[in-house]
Each structure stands twice: as structure tokens, then as C-alpha cells.
């Protein structure tokens, strides 16, 4: 296996040359590649329709638990101060209160329709984050609906518990912060930042249908929360110092201000997601984009089959994360390789995200892997346009592949293993 372990050395060399400026450039490239500006616009429109239903459902859940009933007003205040710029939250809070009061008077059928609207927002978020993580297979729809309905019902309780804990911590810490100038104010400003960081990190960790490293999720969540707070201050400064919208729209200025704020907020959420997703693939970007490594996927597929073949002998199951670590590949690269192998019936996913090889290595030739990942002449014969010379060339290439790559994987990896040392004679 020495032949295949050496291929990771160029990758390890590249990992040492990570520069923050290059990483931010990579993040911005991915941000626009995933059309995050258009997705933020779609989420803004869906949020406008879903915000009141989500608030109504959340408050009804809170009302069902007397222990958190006293936090109902504080939850609304927390949502407004977090989601709405200070210059506009007074007017919007009045409208939100009226909408929530009207929604509370609806029947069970009416609330169910509101729930559908709220779930539509969550499904849109689900698709957006999975697209950023380049996930090709989403969770089953019923599974996703159950998860997000649980979030709608349990989320308000968690917010209430967080506010209760925050209130207790602030009361308990006054003895420590009393002697620190501005200590209480600093604690008040840090609490929303911490709660927002936790919310973003949990979303980046749970929503993508992929195993996300918790360090990457936290990094993206903290970055998004810090950017969110900075943007909130900047937006409030712009609205108060440059009242362009008030001058143009008059009393209706709250509407475009709120829409613009929602759009910028979703841009920040998506940027944090791109940062979290980029951390897993950035280390291997230069090696993967090397023009001299266009056949690298074929070589990586051989290495992956070698690992699964050894696991098959030992009766073990390899997870996607262990494959990434052993091959030093990004999650996207491993997933693309496994998808093609599943279609070729080389491997299969078992319970709990494990992967096993279902075809005997003696039955898989190197030519089979080459045709799957590099070049399949038979598939291009119809594009020759009837040119007999090109058709003959493709036939010759196919014959050459079969002749030069007829070795089965069982013999390839056996021959690659180092021979045991000879015994010393007495």
C-alpha cells in the first residue's frame, strides 16, 4: 500500500501554505458560485410570509408551559432586537404584535396552514445549506418535515430556557461585574452574540445531510454572528444618519427598510455557511485544481477501494469521515467517488453512514475503475460522426485499456504490500 500512501504527501505540503487572504478569496468565489445573492432574495420573500406564522406558533407553544409564560414578551423582544434594526423595530413590533394576536385567534385548520408556510421557509433553508455543502442527496421529505416541525415546537422552549439562564447568569454575575466599568453593558451585549452564535453553529451542524466537523460549524457560526452584529450597528447608523428611505417613502419607509434588513441578514447567514463548508475543502483546493492531476479521481478511487478491500477482509465498516481522513480528501470529493461506485455496484452504504465493498476485489479490474472515473471509449463511439478513423481509434484505445489494465484489484494491492523481512540465519 506504500504506492498509494505516497500520494497524500503533496496534499500535506499544500496544507502548510494556508493564507487568510487566499482563504477569503476562496470563500467569496464559492459564495457567488452558489448564487447566494439570489438565494438570499428568495429567503427574504419566504421569511416575509413565514415570520408571523413562526412567531404565532412559538408563542402558542410558550403559552402551553406556565414556567415560560413570563418570558413571552421577552422572547418577542429578543426576536425583534435580533432580527430588526433598532431604527425600525418600534414600528415593526407594533405590527408584529397585531399580526400575532390575530393569528392566535385562528382555528386549528388556520394554524395548520400557518405551519405549512413556516415549514416552507425551513425547507428553503434546508435546500440552500445543502447546496452550499454540495450535498447531492437530501434527506427524505417526511424526515425533513418531522425535524423542522420539532424545531418549530421545541425551538421556542429553548429560547425561553436560554433567556431564563441568561437572566440568572446576569443576576449571579453582578457581584463580579459591579467593579468593572461597563461590565453589565458588556454582558448585555455579549448575550445576544453568544445565543446567535449557538443558533448559527447548530444550523450548520445539523441541517446539511453530511457529517460536518463541529469545529467548522462553530467557526462559521461565530463568524456569521460577529458579522451579523457589526452589520446591525452599521445598518442602524446608516438609517439614522442618512434617512433616504424616510425621505422617499415617508410613513411607508419601514417596509423597504425591513426587506433590506432581511436580505442583508440572509446574506450574512449564507456567508457563515460558506465559511463553514469551505474549511473542509480549502486545504485540498490547490492540489485538486492542479492541471497535472486531472486523473487524480481515478487514482483516488483506487486508493478508496484499497481501503474498503482491507476493511472487507477485517470485517469492518469504514465511515465517510474515516475515508476522508485516510485519503486526505474533501467531503465533496469522497462523496462524488462513492456515488459513482454505488451506481457501478462496487460499494454500498449501510446503517449509521458506514460504507462497505460489496464486490469481490478479484472481480474488479483496474480497467473497470478507469472506465468509471477517467475514460470510457465505448460511450464516445456514437459521437465520432461516422468517421471510421475515429471509431477505429476508440476501438484501439478500448483494447489497450483491457490489455494494459486487466489486473484485478486483489492482485494490485497484494503486489503493493511490502514483503516480510527474511529470517536471519543462525
Swiss-Prot record:
Q: Which InterPro entries match?
A: UPF0761_bac, Virul_fac_BrkB
- Lineage of origin: Bacteria, Pseudomonadati, Pseudomonadota, Betaproteobacteria, Nitrosomonadales
* Family annotation (Pfam families): Virul_fac_BrkB (PF03631)
* Organism from which the protein derives: Nitrosospira multiformis (strain ATCC 25196 / NCIMB 11849 / C 71)
Question: Membrane-spanning residues where?
Answer: 48-68, 106-126, 145-165, 187-207, 217-237, 255-275
- What GO terms fall under cellular component here? plasma membrane
What protein is this chain from? UPF0761 membrane protein Nmul_A0452
Q: Which UniProt keywords apply?
A: Cell inner membrane, Cell membrane, Membrane, Transmembrane, Transmembrane helix
User: Subcellular location, in the record's words?
Assistant: Cell inner membrane
In what way does this protein cross or attach to the membrane? Multi-pass membrane protein
User: Where the protein is mainly located, per its record?
Assistant: membrane
Record-stated family: Belongs to the UPF0761 family.
Show the coiled coil region(s): none
